[in-house]
Structures are given as structure tokens and as C-alpha cells.
């Protein structure tokens, strides 16, 4: 019993340390995306990355995590949300704390990947709506397929240890769809009188 408790504590600490490192990826993404955009849009990019985490936290707490880690799944596709957070918030968080924090930062990462692909071409309010949707439905459902034992991909033996499919593939596919919808950026590369492209805001990235 002492060994089992110690092992669980080590696993929990590992999850929390990993979550802290992934959390700082938000700052990294913000700097990279700022480096790819014009200086006048730097503040917009920073706010979008901040909103990914803020909005994502609220919706992931309310429904996303319960949907992702549901105990009952419908044909392995969609989980029946665990609504214990509304009746026993303290107990729910205490029991699932490390897993919740770990998946929360991954959810924010998946949402942030899209920001760079649609930089300078989306309104702030529209982006906030997108951020809420992906954090509330898209990420919890597809991550549940992989990381919940009841998910259909998990049932087939699919294994994704670090999130290459659950996070980066989903973020990349969503970014591609968004980039196709909004089209190319206009006015990013402007030539001077000599025909040379003016400097871009690449230092932060």
C-alpha cells in the first residue's frame, strides 16, 4: 500500500510538471506567431493566445473535461458528460486534479496552433467563438477517442503518448481548414522603391 501510494504521487507530480512546461508553450506560440505578423498586429496575436487559455479553461471546466473522461460512451464516439463538477466541485477536482490540469493545457495548445495560420485575417470576437467551440467540443471528443479507454480508437489499440494526433494533428487540420476559409494575407510583404521586400517583424519568433 505505501508503495502504491508513492507511485501514484510520482505519476501525479510528473503530470503536473509536464503540464507546467506545456503551459509555457503558450508564450512560445505567441512569440512565434508575432514574429510572422506585422508589428501593428502583435497585440492582437497576444490577446488571442491569452483568450485561448482563458476561454478554454472556463468551457473545459464546465463540460469539456467531463465529456472527454466520461465513464460511458455511445458506440465509442461521444461520451456522456460527467456532471459531478456541478454537484461536488471540490471532490471532482481533487480526484482528477493532475489529469484535469494536464489535459487543460493540451486543450489550450491545440486551440493556439490555429491562431498562427489565420493571423491578421480574423476578427477578435470570431476567434474567441472558435476558441470556445474547439475547447468545448472538438478537443474533448477527439481526445476522448484516444485517451479514454472507452473511446473507439483506444478500443482498437491506438496509442498516442505525447499528443501527436490528439493535439498537433487536430490543431494542424483545423488550422488548414481555417487558412483555406480566410484565404491569404494581403499587404504582409510590401516592396520598397528598389523592389526589395521591406523588413518583417521576425525578431520575437
PLM regions and their residue ranges:
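Loop-to-helix transition at the N-terminal end of transmembrane alpha-helices
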Residues: 12-13, 40-56
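Hydrophobic alpha-helical transmembrane segments
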Residues: 16, 46-50, 101-102, 128-130
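Membrane-interface loop-to-helix entry segments
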Residues: 101-105, 162-173
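Membrane-water interface regions at transmembrane-helix termini and the short interhelical loops
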Residues: 29-43, 105-125, 142-152, 156-158
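Transmembrane alpha-helix boundary signature
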Residues: 60-94, 113-121, 141-154
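Juxtamembrane interface elements at the cytosolic ends of transmembrane helices
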Residues: 27-35, 109-115, 170-196
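Hydrophobic alpha-helical hairpins/lids featuring a short glycine-rich hinge
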Residues: 90-136
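Single conserved hydrophobic/aromatic residue that forms the stacking wall/gate
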Residues: 1-7, 11
Amino acid at each position: 500500500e505505501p508503495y502504491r501510494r508513492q507511485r501514484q504521487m510520482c505519476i501525479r507530480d510528473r503530470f503536473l510538471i509536464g503540464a507546467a512546461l506545456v503551459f509555457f508553450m503558450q508564450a512560445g506560440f505567441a512569440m512565434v506567431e508575432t514574429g510572422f505578423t506585422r508589428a501593428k498586429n502583435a497585440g492582437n496575436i497576444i490577446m488571442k493566445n491569452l483568450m485561448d487559455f482563458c476561454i478554454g479553461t472556463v468551457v473545459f471546466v464546465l463540460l469539456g473535461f467531463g465529456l472527454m473522461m466520461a465513464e460511458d460512451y455511445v458506440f465509442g464516439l461521444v461520451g456522456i458528460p460527467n456532471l459531478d463538477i456541478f454537484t461536488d466541485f471540490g471532490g471532482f477536482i481533487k480526484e482528477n486534479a493532475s489529469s484535469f490540469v494536464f489535459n487543460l493545457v493540451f486543450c489550450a495548445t491545440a486551440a493556439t496552433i490555429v491562431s498562427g495560420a489565420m493571423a491578421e485575417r480574423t476578427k477578435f470576437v470570431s476567434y474567441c467563438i472558435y476558441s470556445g467551440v474547439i475547447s468545448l467540443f472538438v478537443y474533448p471528443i477527439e481526445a476522448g477517442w484516444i485517451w479514454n479507454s472507452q473511446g473507439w480508437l483506444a478500443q482498437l489499440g491506438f496509442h498516442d503518448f505525447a499528443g501527436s494526433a490528439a493535439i498537433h494533428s487536430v490543431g494542424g487540420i483545423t488550422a488548414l481548414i481555417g487558412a483555406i476559409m480566410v484565404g491569404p494575407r494581403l499587404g504582409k510583404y510590401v516592396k520598397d522603391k528598389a523592389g526589395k521586400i521591406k523588413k518583417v517583424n521576425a525578431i520575437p519568433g
